[in-house]
Amino acid sequence: MSFKDRLFICSQYLLPHHLLSRLIGFAADCRATWFKDRLIAWFARRYQVDMREAQVEDLQAYEHFNAFFTRALKDGARPLAQEPGAVLCPADGAISQLGPIEHGRIFQAKGHSYSLAELLGGDAELAAPFMGGDFATVYLSPRDYHRVHMPLAGTLREMVYVPGRLFSVNQTTAENVPELFARNERVVCLFDTERGPMAVVLVGAMIVASIETVWAGLVTPPKRELKTFRYDEAARAPIRLEKGAELGRFKLGSTAIVLFGPQQVAFNDGLGAASPVRMGECLALPKQS
């Protein structure tokens, strides 16, 4: 590891993650024209954001930076894979890792893995259906579309807010911060689907000011304590989302992790670590029994 990388990793442990993220979140919601127009223009230029696919192409039309960052796309900008039974990629970005969940652990990077149960908030019962299953981790870069969509149609069963740190998420931290995704703040969404249980985990990172879902709105930051929301109780109307429907969004970005049970899906042979992906592309197909 280079000296520069060592310095970066050391800074990750010393910086006040949540304070920085809250301050940046405040700036991202600022509506002052002189400020938000300059910030949006700089960001779009710095990260070469393609506005031609956005519903609103005019950078100055966004009321604040977060509205720009979570911008909607034009109809048809992300066609859904048409293969029978296709499991869709949930977000734009790049595959960080994908593969089997082995011995209750998920591969993070060379020399590092993390606990499935810890990812889901330390609940062994929640983790049980995914033991021996499969996972895919999608990293959303700053230039990407930052809404997360359903890989399969599903009925929401449970949502868990898991407090944690806000380490930056990139290749350097993945290779050098142990249990990165099981340490960062995250929102776990559990669904019942035609392929059995499915989890979509929205993982925060440094400067991720908040995570939203379409059914609950703003999920973070509440009080920093684990909180479970159940949606399969008789008193609640079922929440069902169709394949490709929006699930949630990052106000400033990070990572989406999708989990499936054993013998349910076979990942697209063309995908591997660092493969670029777009929401709606075929991530996997049903595994033949």
UniProtKB/Swiss-Prot annotation:
The modification Pyruvic acid (Ser) is found at S254. The keyword Chaperone does not apply. Is synthesized initially as an inactive proenzyme. Formation of the active enzyme involves a self-maturation process in which the active site pyruvoyl group is generated from an internal serine residue via an autocatalytic post-translational modification. Two non-identical subunits are generated from the proenzyme in this reaction, and the pyruvate is formed at the N-terminus of the alpha chain, which is derived from the carboxyl end of the proenzyme. Binds 1 pyruvoyl group covalently per subunit. InterPro entries: PS_Dcarbxylase (IPR003817), PSD-B (IPR033177), PSD_type1_pro (IPR033178). GO terms for molecular function: phosphatidylserine decarboxylase activity. It is found in: Cell membrane. It comes from the Bacteria. It is an enzyme of class 4 (lyase). The record marks G253, S254 as: Cleavage (non-hydrolytic). Keywords: Cell membrane, Decarboxylase, Lipid biosynthesis, Lipid metabolism, Lyase, Membrane, Phospholipid biosynthesis, Phospholipid metabolism, Pyruvate, Zymogen. It catalyses: a 1,2-diacyl-sn-glycero-3-phospho-L-serine + H(+) = a 1,2-diacyl-sn-glycero-3-phosphoethanolamine + CO2. Its cofactor is pyruvate. Heterodimer of a large membrane-associated beta subunit and a small pyruvoyl-containing alpha subunit. This is Phosphatidylserine decarboxylase proenzyme. It comes from Pseudomonas aeruginosa (strain LESB58).
